[in-house]
């Protein structure tokens, strides 16, 4: 029997409706006993109240670094610009400041003293050296209090309902230029095996599946982890070293895409610290034949 036939054979409308009704009843009883409260301010009603939504330090894409997504990086953030200088693509006197008074112009060129185009600079920043695998990164908000609580409550206190809240946020930050119908798919950074055993769920896979439904993009489970230590508490250089060989490509995850490797992937993770995790995973995806990989994270360190 084909996969499609097997799925059809398992459909039982009456049982499905009964199960749905029981779930609704269960949810109603739980809500009476344990009312939903905002995870940030504890006000009853929703997981994230409107007042707290307005207080979240969202990163304005118009003022963020166009390459790594750093908040207020404006035209090119210091980190990315330093990377370009180190690779001799921009002269030291062409460094852009955080105010954007030198460096890339809004029209797409560099400062009057430079000759490189924005496209060339972007290629250097995100496609050469250690960052070659990522084409661009976007983050929703800065990982600061009280917003970091959204992620820690979701991951460590197993509030799975927050997966939908995070998926909604991510959906609003997907760059439309990344999406080409039939060519773009979603992939989530998989949880470490130890974390999966401790939590009982893969937190970014849960978010990725919900994001897939919101954006009508296929979700591909094509990455799996190779044993490594926890990244938390490690320095930037230690993170880079720790991530080497930490992911492997799983071709069986392409079954939902009829075995076809997508041209573009939006790679989803929770927090961007140094970028080591995203870069390691993106490298594996590109080695598998994916042409472009865009990073999308819920938060990033300021």
Feature names for model-found ranges:
Residues 1-302:
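Glycine-rich phosphate/pyrophosphate-handling loop used in enzymes and phosphotransfer proteins
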